């Protein structure tokens, strides 16, 4: 098994991850389950690395994945320059406990 399936169809899983990544860049922190946060972290770090290039091709590549254009603008104008000197490790995961309904491990995923 090369990746997490989350019990979802391919389209649903991709849409969920795109929504979580968009929310992470828009709000700079999200609360979600542990496995979802690990997948979102991987995608988000790659997008920040692409955004650090700052050219038109990089912007178009990010627009393919992130739903909202204003979030891409924020990624390129404020988030990417913030990490210009950092070589990876743009996010952190903080455990916040367990969800009451199903005891799923909840974490806070935030930009450093």
UniProtKB/Swiss-Prot annotation:
The organism's superkingdom is given as Bacteria
Q: Which GO terms describe its molecular function?
A: structural constituent of ribosome
Q: Which InterPro entries does the protein's record reference?
A: Ribosomal_bL17, Ribosomal_bL17_CS, Ribosomal_bL17_sf
For this record, the Gene Ontology CC terms, alphabetical, are: cytosolic large ribosomal subunit
Pfam families linked to this entry: Ribosomal_L17 (PF01196)
One biological-process term from Gene Ontology? translation
Q: Which UniProt keywords apply?
A: Ribonucleoprotein, Ribosomal protein
Q: How does it assemble?
A: Part of the 50S ribosomal subunit. Contacts protein L32.
Family affiliation:
Belongs to the bacterial ribosomal protein bL17 family.
Tell me what this protein is called: Large ribosomal subunit protein bL17
User: What gene codes for this chain?
Assistant: rplQ
